């Protein structure tokens, strides 16, 4: 008897969401509309690199790479998704690192914003960027796409930290992309290990009997580079190294790597007006203070190349080493004049424009001595620095730095603070509450303005970090035109002006001062560290018996009064807090990603 072939079973579905949902309802295998060609090209490259890495035993064959197409998922930009799966305590867990791919061939709709302009409201249009595209809806659609492609419809999807492959990146640079793939898989492993109950890193793991730890400061001023080769300003590089004691050998015929981690930073001289007299009573400050406050801006935190893990505990330990630039006021060495550079945005002599002299101090001659340098800084720069971090939602540490961004404020703040404190307690073995009360004090506060990240081309055609245009850079670029310089400075921190207007005006100054080669990749949230948290972290690590020697710290100012303090605890906390409050606005621009349950980081 001949069997009757049955046709496909027809299911009645209710059309919801309009015509845009038709492909979700009537799903088919193939497509002819092409989609995002750049994302398709990237997928082919990554699949090739995946096969090579597995064949060369650089990676295990236990991960996937999916394309998240903008047309299919109705989002602003396509992405590649590096995916790892595991069953943890009976729960299907999927971790992904989204590699978002902006495309110059795709024009995003502009953002329409209503702003207050005096007594009136007006609507302005602003260009959308990657941060605008990567919303909670975008993340939720990534989760739906992964569940569909893996067939794990009930799986928990965790975010290993998104990054951006900029539109101008050459997809033929396979060496860099292979390293990006390996790093992305390792970041997925970080999140799976955390969920699986892996023992967290602690400083107790470093207390070997045959070695010591030493911090080294490097002031070459050459930029570091991120995973894709884009420059990161690094006027000061603090590296932590393990040093074997004399006569000790760890391995026969093999020299182990000695570097543990490194932190990049630069000194931004924030203009700090004199405190005004209080409305009631005596003035808050009777002594005339220098007009500039040094802000140590941390731009990059990374583990040594040989160390593949990157966890909250490892990040905090590396971060703590940034504070060692306070030893003997070492941070000031990054401001020393560079002889031979004619057009120098970092010429410290430009701060003379803000002095009573109201003129540039000539620093490029042999007659400008170390004594002159010390006197210039003593008169113009306050001795105690503020510490800041540029936190990047799409950087190499995105999964960790998103937690610190959440700690700046918003609906996820409480969870973020708890995660940071838990990380510190893991690092030191518990008891951090003896050093810092996070219930009554913030860990970090918002600067109030997003920092545009990107690069420009210098005179030799080399890419340099856009953040070279800081307070000192703008003073030099404006040639002492204080009115123009103050207009630039307002685009950086005048919270009375809408952030989108500040960003637009800031980009105009970028083109004026840096040239038309300026290219933007994403934005960073600049946070100001609570000085009491800095002290507490430093003391807590020291309290568990970890001693770090300073390998190459020299006295910068000899016997001058501005010689500074030997440890961060010696700084006047109230003085630092005063600076912080002058820079922070409660109305600071801090857009929240991942409202409620949508972030995927926790």
From Swiss-Prot:
Residue ranges of the region described as Disordered: 1-33
CC annotations in GO: host cell cytoplasm
Subcellular location: Host cytoplasm
Ranges of Low complexity composition bias in the record: 1-14
Domain of life of the organism encoding this protein: Viruses
Alphabetical keyword list: Host cytoplasm
Transmembrane residue ranges: none
Predominant place of localization: host cell
Subunit description: Homotetramer. The tetrameric protomers further assemble as a square grid.
Role summary: Self-assembles to form a proteinaceous shell that encloses the viral DNA and compartmentalizes proteins and DNA during viral infection. This micrometer-scale compartment contains narrow pores and is the site of viral replication, with the proteins involved in DNA replication localized inside. Provides a surface for docking of capsids during packaging. Probably protects the viral genome against host defenses.
Protein name in the entry: Chimallin
Gene source species: Pseudomonas phage PhiPA3 (Pseudomonas aeruginosa phage PhiPA3)
């Amino acid at each position: 008897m001949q069997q009757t072939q049955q046709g496909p079973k027809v299911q009645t579905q209710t059309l919801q969401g309009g015509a845009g949902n038709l492909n979700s309802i009537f799903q088919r295998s193939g497509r002819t509309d092409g989609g995002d060609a750049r994302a398709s090209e990237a997928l082919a490259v990554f699949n090739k690199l995946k096969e090579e890495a597995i064949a060369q035993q650089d990676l295990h064959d236990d991960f996937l790479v999916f394309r998240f197409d903008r047309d299919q998922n109705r989002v602003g930009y396509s992405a590649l998704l590096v995916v790892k799966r595991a069953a943890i305590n009976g729960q299907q867990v999927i971790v992904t690192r989204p590699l978002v791919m902006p495309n110059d061939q795709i024009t995003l709709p502009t953002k329409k914003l209503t702003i207050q302009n005096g007594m009136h409201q007006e609507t302005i249009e602003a260009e959308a960027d990657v941060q605008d595209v990567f919303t909670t809806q975008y993340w939720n659609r990534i989760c739906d796409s992964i569940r569909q492609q893996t067939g794990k419809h009930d799986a928990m999807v965790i975010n290993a930290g998104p990054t951006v492959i900029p539109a101008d990146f050459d997809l033929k640079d396979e060496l860099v992309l292979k390293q990006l793939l390996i790093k992305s898989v390792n970041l997925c492993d970080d999140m799976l290990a955390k969920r699986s109950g892996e023992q967290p890193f602690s400083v107790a793991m470093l207390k070997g009997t045959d070695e010591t730890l030493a911090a080294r400061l490097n002031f070459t001023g050459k930029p570091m580079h991120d995973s894709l080769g884009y420059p990161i300003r690094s006027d000061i590089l603090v590296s932590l190294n393990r040093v074997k004691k004399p006569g000790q050998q760890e391995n026969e015929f093999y020299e182990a790597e000695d570097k543990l981690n490194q932190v990049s930073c630069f000194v931004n001289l924030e203009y700090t007006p004199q405190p005004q007299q209080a409305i009631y009573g005596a003035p808050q400050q009777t002594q005339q203070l220098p007009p500039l406050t040094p802000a140590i801006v941390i731009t990059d935190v990374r583990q040594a190349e040989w160390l593949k893990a990157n966890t909250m505990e490892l990040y905090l330990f590396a971060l703590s080493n940034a504070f060692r630039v306070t030893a003997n006021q070492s941070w000031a060495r990054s401001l020393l004049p560079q002889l031979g550079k004619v057009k120098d945005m970092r010429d410290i002599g430009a701060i003379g424009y803000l002095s009573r002299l109201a003129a540039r101090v000539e620093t490029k001659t042999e007659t400008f001595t170390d004594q002159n340098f010390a006197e210039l800084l003593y008169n113009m720069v306050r001795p105690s620095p503020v510490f800041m971090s540029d936190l990047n939602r799409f950087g190499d540490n995105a999964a960790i730095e998103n937690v610190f961004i959440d700690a700046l404020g918003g609906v996820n703040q409480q969870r973020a603070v708890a995660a940071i404190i838990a990380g510190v307690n893991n690092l030191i073995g518990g008891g951090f509450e003896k050093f810092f009360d996070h219930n009554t004090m913030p860990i970090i506060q918002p600067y109030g303005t997003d920092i545009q990240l990107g690069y420009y081309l210098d005179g030799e055609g080399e890419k340099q970090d856009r953040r070279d245009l800081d307070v000192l850079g703008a003073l030099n670029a404006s040639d002492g035109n204080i009115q123009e310089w103050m207009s630039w400075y307002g685009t950086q921190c005048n919270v009375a002006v809408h952030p989108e207007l500040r960003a637009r005006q800031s980009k105009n100054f970028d083109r004026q001062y840096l040239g038309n080669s300026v290219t933007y990749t994403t934005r960073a949230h600049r946070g100001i560290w609570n000085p009491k948290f800095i002290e507490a972290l430093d003391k807590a690590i020291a309290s568990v018996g970890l001693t770090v020697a300073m390998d190459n710290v020299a006295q910068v100012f000899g016997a001058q009064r501005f010689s500074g303090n030997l440890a961060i605890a010696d700084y006047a906390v109230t003085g630092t807090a005063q600076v912080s409050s002058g820079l922070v606005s409660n109305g600071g621009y801090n857009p929240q990603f991942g409202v409620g349950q949508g972030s995927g980081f926790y």
